[in-house]
Structure formats: C-alpha cells, structure tokens
Regions:
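Generic helix N-cap/helix-start motif at coil->alpha-helix transitions
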Residues: 1-7, 15-20, 27-36, 45-48, ...
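Amphipathic alpha-helical segments within well-ordered protein domains
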Residues: 9-10, 70, 155
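Inward-facing hydrophobic residues that define packing positions of alpha-helical scaffold repeats
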Residues: 24-25, 85-86, 120-123, 154-155
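Non-catalytic extracellular/periplasmic "stalk"
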Residues: 42, 50-52
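Non-catalytic all-alpha helical scaffold/repeat segments
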Residues: 54, 78-93
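Alpha-helical structural signal with a strong bias for long, charge-/Ser/Thr/Gly-rich
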Residues: 84-88, 106-109, 143, 153
Length: 174
C-alpha cells in the first residue's frame, strides 16, 4: 500500500540508508515522489528546511519531512533549528509527542553550544519529563561552572537518576 511504502521510505531515510530509500521510491504513489525528493534533500542538506514556504502544505508526509529536517539541522545549527521549528510549529499541527521529542533533540544539541542557557530554559516543554534533556543541561552547567544550576537541575531528575553515583557525587560536591 502507498502508506506502507512511505513508512518504509521514511525509515530508510532516517536510518541513513540512501540506496534503499532510492529503491523504495518506485513503490511510492506518484503524488508522493516529489515529496520523497524533498525528504532526501532535507536529509542531505538540512539547511533546506529553513525555506519554510516549501513546506507549508498540511500533509502528514510534509510533517515527517519537517521533523526529520529539523533534527538534522539541529546537529550542526541548533539555534537555527529551534527558531525554524518554532515557525513550523505555528503552521503545522504536529503530534504533541513528536513535537516534544523534536524539542528535546534540539535542546540536547543546544546544550553542547556556548551561550545557549536562555534558549534551553525557554524550551516549550517541561524538562522534568525528559531526564536525558536534564542530564544534558547538567553537563552544560558543569562545563560553565554554574554550580547553583547544577544543583537545581539534579533535583529535577527523577529519583532513580538522582541516586546514580555520578549525580550523587556532583550533588555532594556542590
């Protein structure tokens, strides 16, 4: 079926299996082949996703492309990815869990950058629901020698994470 073909194509792109994705294009419906080209382009040149006018169509496949492209962009330009995704978030009705997952992904990559603390604090998700994001923010606070932030963030972690030896050490050290 066309939906199954798109699903497999999407999984191939996400797994970075370009040859498999190219092979799977032949099984897509004719109307989806142009979107497949856009998907590949968003994968290989993530900055392409910043052209918002190209991806305004309300379509589940377009939303797949946008989410994937934003994640790819976040790997090297997390600040750009965040601002671009906020614009898309106003246009498209993303699934809340997919949207939150994308914000977490962007947040983790923002934590590797300097001077992004304000952006991290203003992500539209509750950090206590995403321990991997909190851990990334703790590591950033440690790099920045922001001890009060380290303590605040460690306390945001769920109990089972707080009792891990590494976080117990830093909590005691602070």
């Amino acid at each position: 079926t066309p939906d199954l073909a798109w699903q497999r194509f999407s999984l191939a792109i996400q797994a970075n299996k370009q040859k498999l994705a190219t092979y799977l294009v032949r099984f897509l419906a004719k109307k989806d082949r142009q979107l497949a080209t856009s998907y590949k382009k968003a994968h290989t040149r993530p900055s392409e996703i910043k052209r918002i006018s190209r991806y305004k169509t309300q379509n589940p496949h377009v939303r797949d492309i946008v989410l994937h492209g934003i994640k790819r962009l976040a790997r090297h330009q997390p600040e750009e990815a965040l601002s671009t995704f906020r614009q898309y978030d106003e246009i498209h009705s993303f699934d809340p869990s997919a949207s939150a997952e994308t914000f977490v992904y962007i947040g983790k990559h923002l934590s590797y950058e300097d001077d992004t603390s304000d952006l991290l604090e203003n992500l539209p998700i509750d950090p206590s629901d995403y321990p991997e994001l909190v851990e990334a923010r703790i590591r950033k606070a440690l790099r920045d020698d922001d001890w009060s932030e380290v303590l605040i963030l460690i306390n945001l972690l769920p109990e089972k994470f707080q009792h891990q030896p590494g976080w117990r050490y830093w909590k005691a050290r602070v």
